[in-house]
Amino acid sequence: MYLLPAIDILDGRAVRLAKGDYTQVTVYNDDPVDQARKFESQGATWIHVVDLDGARTGVPENIAIVERIVRETSLSVEIGGGIRTLETLARLADIGAARMVLGTALVNDPDLARAAVERVGGDRLTAGIDAKGGEVAVSGWIEGSGVAACDLAREMGKAGFKHIVYTDIARDGMQTGLDVRAYVQMAEAFEHPVIASGGVASVSDIERLAPVAASIEGVITGRAVYEGTLTVEEGVAACAAATKE
């Protein structure tokens, strides 16, 4: 297990949304690159970046910022938001993103998943499955899809994806704790460990994952590290300890 501090970019700034609601925005840093440097100095080796503008419009709008983070830090960058074509995928791969997250496109364009695996390989791809009540949400969490999260995870595993970020929308940005059982179910469907996202409030939430660490690849945290209820150092150490148990 490893920690992925989150940087969500909206209008060029590092923000967090509450439950994915674009009207409930908290700005934490006017410079996402500076925020990435801070996370690196605190011990992070990975970060999870979401282009919120791109998630809403369908076209990444903050690639230049992502490129600067890749170039100016040693962080491995997982990037999502608006990646809905092979051309966009290839562009992000070319600038050095470690992994690209496909979300809405997996539902709206199922053929893209297999084409993406052929283009960049399954290990550089993450299926971003955002769900509310077990149903996958799309278009920046604005729309329901009618697709069950576990069913989509199963399909992506068969398509060749090696990573999944599973986000519980109802918990995201709310610091209400993790739904451990849901992550285990997703890992079973996907047949690979999953990256847990949504609800981390403190180090104790990460510690709760220790008994199921075999099902958890990593943990994304956002608001908790910005507001100080969890430090990056604590999160990195807790992930490492959980893996050893």
Residues of each region from the PLM?
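Conserved, mostly hydrophobic/aromatic
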Residues: D8, F39, I47, I79, ...
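C-terminal helical cap(s) of enzyme catalytic domains, especially alpha/beta-barrels
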Residues: L112-R119, E207-T221, V225-E245
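Structural preference for beta-strand elements that scaffold enzyme active sites
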Residues: Y2-A6, W46, S74-E78, A98-V101, ...
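Glycine-rich, proline-tolerant flexible connector loops at the mouths of alpha/beta enzymes
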Residues: W46-A64, T104, V165-T176
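Glycine/small-residue-rich loop that forms an oxyanion/phosphate-binding "nest" at active or ligand-binding sites
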Residues: D53, E61-V120
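Charged helix-capping and loop-helix junction motifs
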Residues: P60-E67, P110, I142-D151, T176-Q185
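Catalytic cores of alpha/beta
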Residues: T73-M100, R181-S215, G235
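Conserved anion-binding
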Residues: K19-T23, A93, A97-D172
